[in-house]
Amino acid sequence: MSRSARPGNTVTLPPTTSTGTAMSSSQSSSSSSASSVVKRLDLSSRTAPPLGGLSLPLLSLEVRRRLRNRRSVIFSIVLPVAFFLMFTTTDYSAMPYGNGNVVANMMIGMALYGALMTTTGAGAAVSNERASGWSRQLRLTPLKPIAYITAKAIVGMLISALAIGAVYACGPVRHAQMPARVWISSALIIWLGSLVFVAFGLFVGYLLPSDNAMQVVGPLMALLAFLGGMFIPLTPGSTMDRIGSFTPMYGLHNLALWPMGAESFSWWWVVNVLTWLAVFLGGAAWKMGRDTARV
């Protein structure tokens, strides 16, 4: 007796048509392409870039960003030159100072001021980057924090060389006189010493929000320059000289003037520079560590 299939027991199998075959092949191809994408995005296969990510394109980007900032260029290069030309409208070329003249003294002070403004601004720029979210984006990349800080320092030093050169180029116009070795040695001391204020700028940049950082830096730098004797020479042993000897720019300014031979060398200048360098580095590392922990 033959059995007839009941409607309730009927099992419908998926058709093995060409359409089904096409769907199957399409799924397999999409799976293979997805797996290739996963392989390309496999984070475990990423390796740290050389030098922690420090590269010429990164430095070039930072330099362009700094030079596009008109306020930075004015305060770092134009303003020191304007101050030097303004303060030397009276002819001081006949007034001796060490193995040079008073004009050379004032030139060194204004060149130092411009260099410190440049390096401080390079460090303090992190405040704007934090506010815009740029620094947080960078921390999601393989770029190491030390490479990021090194890039800031190198860019600050490169532009500070422009500030020093701009002021020194105006020296002969105002009849600045000193031996060739003093021109070179004083410029090198200014350039290397300005690295201290990269740490100061970083400390301020991580300490204050972007709206306040640059507003604080400008007046504060002017006050420190005044206490360091860069605008008006301080009388040795005076009350202002004793107060200024504990401020960050005092040691750098006197070290830059030392090649002129007007004053004997003092180790207090070196202690002053190293102490403030330690303070600025410690403060910058502390604030940067807390900022990094947010990500």
Regions found by a protein language model. Name each.
Residues 4, 42-132, 160, 176, ...:
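Transmembrane helix-boundary elements of multi-pass transport/secretion proteins
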Residues 11-17, 22-59:
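Short, Lys/Arg-rich, polar N-terminal cytosolic tail immediately upstream
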Residues 40, 50-58, 230-270:
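Short hydrophobic, aromatic-rich alpha-helical segments embedded in or entering the lipid bilayer
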Residues 86-90, 205-246:
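Transmembrane helix segments
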Residues 106-112, 185-199, 219-226:
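Small-residue-enriched core segments of transmembrane alpha-helices in multipass membrane transport
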Residues 125-157:
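Helix-loop-helix units of permease transmembrane domains in multi-pass membrane transporters
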Residues 139, 143, 174, 208, ...:
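Short helix-loop-helix connector
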Residues 145-215, 266-274, 278-284:
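Alpha-helical transmembrane segments and their short interhelical loops
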